[in-house]
Amino acid sequence: MWWATVHELSLCQAIAGVVRPYAEGRRVDVVRVQVGALRQVVPDSLSFCWTIVREHENMPEAELELEFVTAEVRCRGCGQQSEIASRWSVCCPRCDSAEVEVVRGNEFLVTSLEVS
């Protein structure tokens, strides 16, 4: 699946773009990122792509730590807020309605850095 790696490569480039201004010439040791279950990220591909991007962004030692966020929806029909098991179906597990609002699971956020 080369297209999955291309997707993760662009995500890693975006991460580096966020990190760069905050590093301000210091060594980046750790980058922490929240990834929602609905973002269709392949963790192994993201980690692999990070090893490539960090070399080109002058942060060769920077480790990528991922925190995965489960998907949760609130049903507009029955009002139930539920965790969903499948990233392919965001229907309400209680009443099967597709009229839902995603509460969690769309995150893709750099949450913190460690620099030295």
Q: What are these language model-derived features?
A:
Residues 1-62:
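Long, charged N-terminal interaction/targeting segments
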Residues 34-38, 67-71, 113:
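Short loop/turn motifs enriched for small/polar and acidic residues
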Residues 65-73, 84-86:
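Immediate flanking context of iron-sulfur cluster ligation sites
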Residues 73, 90, 108:
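Cys/His-enriched microdomains
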Residues 75-78, 92-95:
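Short cysteine-rich clusters marking metal-coordination/redox-active sites
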Residues 81-82, 99:
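Cys/His-rich microdomains that often coordinate metals
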Residues 85-88, 102-106:
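Short Cys/His-rich "knuckle" micro-motifs
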